[in-house]
């Protein structure tokens, strides 16, 4: 999208209030959605909750193909469709809602750096586990990803996706990594996040930002998703302040879930 077009979209978005019927689309929750997409969806849900903006979550088998970027989640607000956390944050900001306006320029740069860390390490590790770890691929990924579709389409779509992810892994230098090396990267990422969080309730003290939403989305999903082993979730559990952070956001922003899954 050109800068002129982006500015025009921002102007339109800013003139319209947030509607009550805003919708977030993701894949089927129980039987289809994978770890990385679930984490991305939860991050956006957390961000909108933190902004006090209502959104209805709708699960569709073809959500990935409905998305303008081919990635989930995406939101449908008025006549606008926006996908992924970064563009959604900018879209919401154009409507006058921002979680990071109170930060100075140095803090904003730091926030963006940590968000890059999460995307480069945690998200990539999730994709690696889903599509490059043979045990996970064989026992979980193929069956879940293709679950809405008949044979042989279910396998064709899954293997196409696996090929895409493996090509990406090779391009970024993760193609020859072992699972142990990936888990070590996750541990280093969690260590950096734990040190930055310290004893604060949120990464920038008392108020959450989009960084908090992103970290929560990934860590909470890692902690609550059943995989072929507990190795990934155990890396997160080594950091008590990250666990407390996830519980805090779950209890404060997702109280309608009832008894917390991290209790």
From Swiss-Prot:
It is found in: Mitochondrion outer membrane; Mitochondrion. The modification N-acetylserine is found at residue 2. Gene3D superfamilies: 1.20.1050.10. One of its GO terms (cellular component) is nucleolus. Pfam families: GST_C_6 (PF17171), Tom37 (PF10568). Belongs to the metaxin family. Interacts with MTX1/metaxin-1. Associates with the mitochondrial contact site and cristae organizing system (MICOS) complex, composed of at least MICOS10/MIC10, CHCHD3/MIC19, CHCHD6/MIC25, APOOL/MIC27, IMMT/MIC60, APOO/MIC23/MIC26 and QIL1/MIC13. This complex was also known under the names MINOS or MitOS complex. The MICOS complex associates with mitochondrial outer membrane proteins SAMM50, MTX1 and MTX2 (together described as components of the mitochondrial outer membrane sorting assembly machinery (SAM) complex) and DNAJC11, mitochondrial inner membrane protein TMEM11 and with HSPA9. This is Metaxin-2. It comes from Mus musculus. The gene is Mtx2.
């Amino acid at each position: 999208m050109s800068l002129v077009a982006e500015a025009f979209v921002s102007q339109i978005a800013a003139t319209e209030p947030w509607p009550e019927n805003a919708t977030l689309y993701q894949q089927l929750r129980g039987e289809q959605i994978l770890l990385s997409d679930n984490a991305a969806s939860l991050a956006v849900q957390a961000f909108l909750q933190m902004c006090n903006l209502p959104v209805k979550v709708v699960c569709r088998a073809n959500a990935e193909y409905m998305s303008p970027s081919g990635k989930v989640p995406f939101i449908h607000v008025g006549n606008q469709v926006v996908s992924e956390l970064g563009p959604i944050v900018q879209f919401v900001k154009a409507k006058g809602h921002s979680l990071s306006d109170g930060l100075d320029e140095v803090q904003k740069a730091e926030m963006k750096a940590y968000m890059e860390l999460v995307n480069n390490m945690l998200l990539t590790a999730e994709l690696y586990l889903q599509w490059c770890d043979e045990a996970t691929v064989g026992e979980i990924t193929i069956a879940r990803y293709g679950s809405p579709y008949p044979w042989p389409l279910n396998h064709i779509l899954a293997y196409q996706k696996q090929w895409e992810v493996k090509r990406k892994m090779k391009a970024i230098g993760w193609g020859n990594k072992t699972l142990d090396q990936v888990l070590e990267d996750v541990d280093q990422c969690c260590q950096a996040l734990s040190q930055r969080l310290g004893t604060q309730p949120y990464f920038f003290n008392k108020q959450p930002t989009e960084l908090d939403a992103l970290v929560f989305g990934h860590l909470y999903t890692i902690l609550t998703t059943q995989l072929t082993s507990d190795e990934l979730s155990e890396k997160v559990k080594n950091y008590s302040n990250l666990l407390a952070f996830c519980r805090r956001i779950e209890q404060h922003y997702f109280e309608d879930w009832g008894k917390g899954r991290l209790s």
